Amino acid sequence: MTAQSPAPDLYPPVQQEIARLAALAEVRSAFAWFRAHESRLAEYQMEVARIAAPPFGEAARGAWLAGRFRESGLSDVDVDQAGNVFAVHPGYGSRYVALSAHIDTVFPAATPLNIRQQGTKLYGPGISDNGAGIVAMLAIAHALQAAHIPHALPFVFIGNVGEEGEGDLRGMRHVFATPRWNQAIAYSVVVDGAGSDTVVAEALGSRRFEMIVRGPGGHSWSDFGSPNPIIVLARAIDAFSRTPVPVLPKTTFNVGVIRGGTSVNSIPESASMRVDLRSTSMAEIDRLEGALRVALERAVKLENEAASLHTTRKPQAIQSEVVEIGNRPAGELATDARVFKVIRAVDAHLGNAAQVQRASTDANIPLSLGREAVAIGGGGSGGGAHTLQEWFDCNGRDLGLKRILLTMLALAGSGE
């Protein structure tokens, strides 16, 4: 699937349904609510951004969100064992349309959070990713309650943990691994960051490893010839970097972190590196993982053999360990999936130009399971994600919120 996927005019029945929904007095009232309460939404966004939520440290932010869900009038507010926060807007069916946004950030707990507003712009770490997504959920919840919009399938709102970095999508994994929600969620709409110009309908797969090498260590002069963990990693990187990768399916690898050693005249006792493998094909990721493991095994063997030639005493052998620190499955939404038709028809109705993209988001989990899911932005615009200079511009937020609301209502079906 690409940005040149079938045009929305191939889905006239869906477009007609979107036009009907948008003309309802209740929906127009919800649209008006978005505009009238922008200042309140901006306050919510700054409030949540001031609560640190590093990976595996989201509890305080989760408690805040549970309180806001209750305040909005949603029912069945709950926090599961993983820390995911749930709330329900009732309907008439047994299956749900899920609206989710991750509540974690990439920033450590001690990061200075200088959250502030200048005009229509909000500034500070996490203000857009994923302050914008969290506030979009709250806006939809409040507007549904205020406008009394009927819909058939109920909505479940999920503030999930563990999307960023080493969180490895743990929150969404837990949602789809639990009997309560595994089969109950019919459609998933993930709100991640700012903007209204993308539709993530293709999940980028990735696998990450930490490779650790340990040896006896020693002095660079008196223990010369003892096996060196850093040299092992250098050999492994050199060999692995020669692994061919295809242009299609697009496949990449990266050695992003190397650690080891204490001084220039010390043979290190240990060294490690972190490697990131990505592809649109899980088979290619499997192939790269195999090549990476072979490269390390051969490098260890070569260094142990070399060490035995440089000393008269039997050297202590190098040992290696490979630890998987991330595994995000790939997946792709079919172009005839209802959620894809709906979001494209919504964009056509709103005159919104959005491109279909591939990315790594919480939608990876349902997509990898063959479920219908997309990830979209919460409106407005943003930049500087994952930096202290992150920003969000509230201008255009209402377009993103209209987009989310119409998509949710169309997926849920009429409650009339």
Where are these predicted regions, by residue range?
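Acidic/His- and Gly-rich active-site-bordering loop/insert found
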Residues: T2-Y123, A146
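Acidic-glycine-rich active-site phosphate/pyrophosphate-binding loop
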Residues: I103-Q117, E202-I212, A345
